[in-house]
Design a protein with these regions (language model features):
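His/Asp/Glu-enriched, well-ordered alpha-helical/loop segment
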Residues: 232, 273-303
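Extended substrate/RNA-proximal surfaces in nucleic-acid metabolism proteins
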Residues: 58-221, 286-290
Length: 303
């Protein structure tokens, strides 16, 4: 790892989960931004690293790639995410292949889509009954229905929040109190299982974006405490969803629970328009000092 200043992004998604760019696309964009420390953290997938192993993508010189993953978890029936850094790709790939076969992923996404259709039918929303989810990608059932609902202006007139993918997902689709709630958690690991497999793969576990879930400060700290009890070593400090004061509050929690910190944009490409690699909405910067206590001790990949 080179000395001096660094340009860092430790959270991004590719076509191997719910992003829109390939591994090589991401590498090209990171090169253009002079990024030199980064991690591909697809949901429940290490496909980017397999692309590199197969020669389907190539690292450029002078960079440090931290092997990573974002594991989707269930906490009391709510979707929560755990990041793993410095993982063994073969160990994590074996776990993911056994837990999430393509057949199982397709079956789950189609079931989620059918449940979403049922809700929208009850709301007299307009959509094509023939749409399907047949690729097994993360959140595919949700995304297919979101795109279809937005093809019909009358749906947006009735429920304006339907045209905001992030708001619809977190405030309604995954919110048990919402009439648009669909349970996605029925086959997901707990925090404990996620941390255990990250550790088994030789990595370190970080609770992802603690403030993205719309919780109060007290509830957010409760969630962080659950992650700590499960064995997590760190938390994601910098993230595009943070509002004013969040970083300071997260820093206080990190000190209180003796947690390492990480940061990244959570870049998804066209699925989250406006969010750019490295800087998110243009004003985010992950400082090397925020990751230096741990980044040198985990497995990394270089050209």
């Amino acid at each position: 790892m080179r000395q001096g200043s660094h340009i860092i992004d430790l959270h991004m998604h590719s076509v191997h989960s719910d992003g829109t760019f390939t591994t090589q696309d991401l590498l090209n964009m990171l090169w253009d931004k002079d990024a030199d420390i980064f991690s591909f953290t697809d949901h429940d997938s290490v496909g980017c690293y397999l692309d590199l192993e197969k020669g389907l993508a190539k690292l450029y010189q002078g960079v440090t790639l931290i092997p990573g993953v974002e594991l989707t978890c269930s906490v009391d029936g709510n979707l929560r995410d755990m990041l793993g850094y410095g993982i063994s790709i073969p160990v994590m790939a074996q776990y993911l292949d056994s837990r999430y076969s393509l057949e199982n992923r397709v079956r789950k996404q189609q079931l989620i889509l059918e449940r979403f259709k049922e809700i929208c039918r009850g709301k007299s929303l307009t959509f094509d009954e023939g749409i399907t989810a047949n690729e097994g990608r993360k959140a595919e059932g949700y995304t297919v229905m979101f795109m279809e609902l937005n093809r019909h202006p009358e749906n947006i007139e009735k429920y304006p929040f339907l045209n905001d993918a992030t708001r619809l997902y977190w405030d309604h689709f995954t919110n048990k109190e919402s009439e648009f709630y669909v349970d996605e958690t029925f086959d997901l690991p707990s925090f404990e299982e996620a941390v255990e497999i990250i550790h088994r793969a030789g990595g370190m576990a970080f609770i992802a974006h603690p403030y993205v879930y719309g919780l109060s400060d007290e509830e957010t700290e409760d969630l962080v405490r659950l992650a700590v009890r499960a064995g997590a070593e760190g938390m994601e400090l910098k993230h595009q969803s943070n509002k004013k004061g969040h970083v300071e509050k997260l820093l206080q929690m990190a000190r209180k629970y003796h947690l390492y910190t990480s940061g990244g944009t959570d870049f998804h490409g066209y699925n989250k328009p406006g969010i750019k690699l490295v800087t998110a909405f243009g004003n985010m910067q992950v400082e090397y000092e925020e990751i230096s206590p741990w980044i040198g001790s985990v497995t990394h990949m270089e050209p």
